[in-house]
């Protein structure tokens, strides 16, 4: 890990400890990761640290005629985050009903990349919950993701350069059907 990321991690650790003195609930249920840190954090949906857009494909069921009211758009089916943040981020978190949020938002801090499922290091929930709990939720997310149409699932995954992935994400080693990794034969669907 780079020295820059170590400083950044320590900075966020101190910031999150002050802002969140008590542990909050985080759980995965029916395709949505419910994260009680989000409403008071808004780090991931606020203005980003660069102008390069972070693409978030929308499922066909989430697309409607006035998407530009909810999101900055890269394409008719792709919302994005950049240095402007998100149009739907309000003072208490997301203003959209859960079913209208991009899958990327519904999974965060789990991140669907073209190589599998990862965990974003800077999220306060990642700092405060044990990794084994994240692995359980990640397996539940994979089990939900594979119920989507294969073409939708593949389009939802994004590509991030490997150096950035190593710096900002935890590799959960959970491949998906389209990822170049071989599925782990020991992986069993999480029984709910």
Regions found by a protein language model. Give the residues of each.
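Short loop/turn segments that flank or connect secondary-structure elements
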Residues: 1-192
């Amino acid at each position: 890990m780079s020295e820059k990321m170590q400083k950044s991690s320590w900075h966020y650790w101190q910031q999150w400890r002050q802002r969140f003195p008590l542990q909050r609930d985080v759980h995965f249920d029916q395709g949505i990761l419910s994260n009680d840190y989000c409403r008071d954090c808004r780090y991931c949906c606020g203005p980003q640290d660069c102008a390069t857009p972070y693409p978030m494909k929308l499922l066909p069921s989430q697309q409607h005629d006035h998407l530009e009211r909810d999101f900055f758009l890269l394409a008719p089916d792709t919302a994005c985050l950049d240095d402007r943040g998100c149009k739907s981020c309000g003072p208490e978190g997301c203003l959209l009903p859960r079913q209208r949020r991009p899958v990327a938002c519904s999974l965060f801090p789990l991140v669907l990349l073209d190589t599998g499922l990862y965990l974003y290091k800077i999220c306060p929930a990642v700092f405060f919950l044990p990794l084994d709990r994240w692995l359980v939720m990640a397996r539940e997310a994979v089990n939900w993701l594979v119920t989507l149409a294969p073409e939708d699932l593949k389009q939802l995954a994004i590509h991030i350069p490997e150096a950035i992935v190593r710096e900002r994400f935890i590799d959960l080693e959970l491949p998906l059907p389209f990822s170049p990794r071989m599925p782990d034969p020991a992986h069993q669907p999480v029984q709910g």
